[in-house]
From Swiss-Prot:
Protein name, as recorded: Salicylate/benzoate carboxyl methyltransferase
Positions of Mg(2+) binding: 188, 275, 277-278
Residue ranges crossing the lipid bilayer per the database entry: none
Binding-site residues, S-adenosyl-L-homocysteine: 40, 82, 87, 119-120, 155-156
Residues reported in the UniProt entry to bind salicylate: 47, 176-177
Tissue expression notes: Expressed in flowers and at lower levels in leaves and stems. Hardly detected in roots and siliques. Expressed in the sepals and the leaf trichomes and hydathodes.
Effect of a null allele: Loss of accumulation of methyl salicylate upon pathogen infection, no accumulation of salicylic acid or its glucoside in uninoculated leaves and no development of systemic acquired resistance. Increased attractivity to parasitoids.
One Gene Ontology molecular-function label: S-adenosylmethionine-dependent methyltransferase activity
Quaternary context: Homodimer.
Family the entry assigns: Belongs to the methyltransferase superfamily. Type-7 methyltransferase family. SABATH subfamily.
Organism listed in the record: Arabidopsis thaliana
Length: 379
């Protein structure tokens, strides 16, 4: 391809012009592809559990969307941050099933449904699309219906769809990923993310980047979704309101930071390399989420819920199993970025260290995670 043409392609992230080589690893942000032992597809039990938790909100908003739009004959649904594997279809299945059951109940014909699966271009769409025939077969058995499935590669911090074309948007455990690493983290060296030892400036930098990104997300989706269309969004969140720096010793990025420090001590990773790595991630609390939505102004909040649940480690047979399962889950969501920055040769050792650190903290066996679920209506 002519490089002159490549240089004219619009940016996939709205602020890519500010993403320099210092944080080049952010461009590798995607889940581990394929269906092997270390893949996202094989290590996404938590994400499946979260989808099940949010199901009542999704069903309720799908029904209300259909009734408020007077049962349209065509529906376009988008799954943003779909990743790879079977989980990509769980929410879509619930949406289609809800629509068909409701239409039967009120004696209406079911609409034709387009389902758009979105993630960054680096995502393993091939593994996901292999499940499309099985998905449509299950729909036919359950609902005597099918849908049309499309891929929509690109950043959800950019425009993805034509104006007023979407009726329902769903996203689960994707919007806590930021478009870039925040600026002004020089005083947070040795930490991948916010910890209790971080300066207040690190928290403010992360919060500002989240506010900027989520505002942009809402603004872009408001152009793409029809009036009275719905969004159901689920985030990794936190409960703490008074201490914005609080992340306990079992927070997944704290454990990963400690594991990388072990490799620095052993001479496998340079300290400067560790200092140059920061996660493009933010876990908001309810108030922070609400403030961005209200300030941006395009959507009404229908529901905003906080759910805490354990990760299931307490029921695992031994500490080693708990440590290995959590290490595999974090590896599945961070490995491509870690390889891009640190190299592939340290990855197995790094997550052996991670699993060990989980076993050293009794609290990790009883660890809980917080999920925020918000449903929105386009004004």
């Amino acid at each position: 391809m002519d490089p002159r043409f490549i240089n004219t392609i619009p940016s996939l992230r709205y602020d890519d012009d500010k993403c320099d080589d210092e944080y080049a690893f952010v461009k590798a942000l995607c889940m581990s592809g394929g269906d092997g032992a270390n893949s996202y597809s094989a290590n996404s039990r938590l994400q499946k559990k979260v989808l099940s938790m949010a199901k009542p909100v999704l069903v309720r908003n799908t029904e209300e969307m259909m009734m408020n739009l007077d049962f349209p004959t065509y529906i376009k649904v988008a799954e943003l941050g779909c990743s790879s594997g079977q989980n990509s279809f769980l929410a879509i299945f619930e949406i289609i099933n809800t629509i068909n059951v409701l239409c039967q109940h009120v004696n209406k014909n079911s609409p034709e449904i387009d389902c758009c699966l979105n993630d960054l271009p680096e995502n393993d769409f091939n593994t996901t699309f292999k499940f499309v025939p099985f998905f449509n077969k299950e729909l036919m058995i359950t609902n005597k219906s099918s849908c049309f499935v499309y891929g929509a590669p690109g950043s959800f911090y950019s425009r993805l769809f034509s104006r007023n074309s979407l009726h329902l948007i769903h996203s689960s455990y994707a919007l806590h990923w930021l478009s870039k690493v925040p600026e002004k983290l020089e005083n947070n060296k040795g930490n991948l993310y916010i910890t209790s030892s971080s300066p207040q400036s690190a928290y403010k930098a992360y919060l500002n980047q989240f506010q900027k990104d989520f505002t942009m997300f809402l603004r872009l989706r408001s152009e793409e979704i029809v009036s009275n269309g719905r969004m159901v969004l689920t985030f990794i969140g936190r409960n703490t309101l008074n201490d914005p720096l609080y992340r306990d010793c079992c927070h997944f990025w704290t454990l990963l930071s400690n594991s990388l420090r072990d490799l620095v001590f052993e001479g496998l990773v340079s300290e400067s390399k560790l200092d140059a790595f920061n996660m493009p991630f933010y876990d908001p609390n309810v108030q922070e989420l609400k403030e961005v939505i209200q300030k941006e102004g395009s959507f009404e909040i229908n529901e905003l819920e906080s759910h805490g649940f354990d990760l299931g480690h307490y029921y695992e047979e031994d500490d080693f199993e708990a440590g290995r399962n959590e290490a595999n889950g974090i590896r599945a969501v961070s490995e491509p970025m870690l390889i891009a920055h640190f190299g592939e040769e340290i990855i197995d050792t790094l997550f052996d260290k991670y699993a060990y650190h989980v076993t050293q903290h009794a609290n990790c066996r009883n660890k809980t995670t917080v999920s925020l679920v918000v449903s929105l209506t386009k004004k």
